[in-house]
Regions:
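Flexible hinge/capping segments at coil-to-helix
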Residues: 131-148
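Ligand-binding cleft/hinge of the Venus flytrap
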Residues: 53-57, 68-77, 141, 154-174
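Short, low-complexity disordered leader/linker segments with a strong preference
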Residues: 1-39
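Solvent-exposed loop/turn segments at secondary-structure junctions
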Residues: 48-51, 87-88, 106-110, 134-136, ...
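Ligand-binding "clamshell"
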Residues: 109-122, 166
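Extracytoplasmic small-molecule ligand-binding "clamshell" domains
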Residues: 26-104
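Short helix-initiation/N-cap motifs at beta->coil->alpha
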Residues: 80-92, 136, 154, 169-183
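Short, well-ordered beta-strand segments
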Residues: 42-46, 129, 147-151
Length: 183
């Protein structure tokens, strides 16, 4: 229970700061009042199981989705999920299409200069995925230098690949990157 409370408090920090990313002078109280007055927390989310995905009935489920639901419940409001294009997350916040982004996010300078962020609640890593039957061929950084990588547009993975000078095909979702590998 203490861990859930800590997670909810961290999420409140994200909500209270990211909900009005273009107006940092607004207080957490006014952001909270804004959400409670309208009765709905609008959450920007992407489709990437197991963190966020829609089940057979179209309901958003997964670690992030479930945490967002619990947080909205603690505020006494409903939650509405809006699937966003990851590369447009800052625009979505600034235009108030969404109140917050609830998703794994690498804290790049672009992200931290555009919105307030909570402390991390999980740690992820960048990985290279290749077909299983080719994995033995790609064991070193040197062995992948001539590959073309698929990465979600606007992601930390895309930025890192570009910084390293690799050939990158931007895709609209992480699941699309996986489909490129499978093709």
């Amino acid at each position: 229970m203490k861990k859930m409370t800590a997670l909810l408090l961290a999420a409140l920090m994200v909500l209270s700061m990211a909900a009005c990313a273009s107006k940092p002078a607004e207080t957490a109280e006014s952001d909270l009042a804004y959400i409670q007055d309208k009765g709905t927390l609008v959450v920007g989310i992407t489709d990437f199981a197991p963190m966020d995905y829609q089940n057979e009935s179209g309901e958003w489920v997964g670690f992030d989705a479930d945490l967002a639901k619990a947080f909205a419940e603690s505020l006494g409001v409903k939650v509405e999920f809006v699937e966003i294009v990851w590369d447009n997350k800052v625009l979505e916040l600034d235009s108030k299409t969404i109140d917050c982004v609830w998703n794994g996010m690498t804290l790049t300078s672009e992200v931290t200069s555009a919105m307030a962020c909570s402390n991390a609640y999980c740690n992820n890593a960048q990985v290279v995925i290749v077909p299983a039957d080719k994995a033995a061929d790609y064991q070193t950084v040197e062995s992948v230098k001539d590959l073309t990588f698929a990465a979600e547009a606007g992601s930390a993975g895309e930025a890192e690949l570009n910084a390293l000078g690799y050939s990158v095909t931007p895709v609209s979702a992480q699941s699309d990157a996986l489909m490129e590998v499978a093709a």
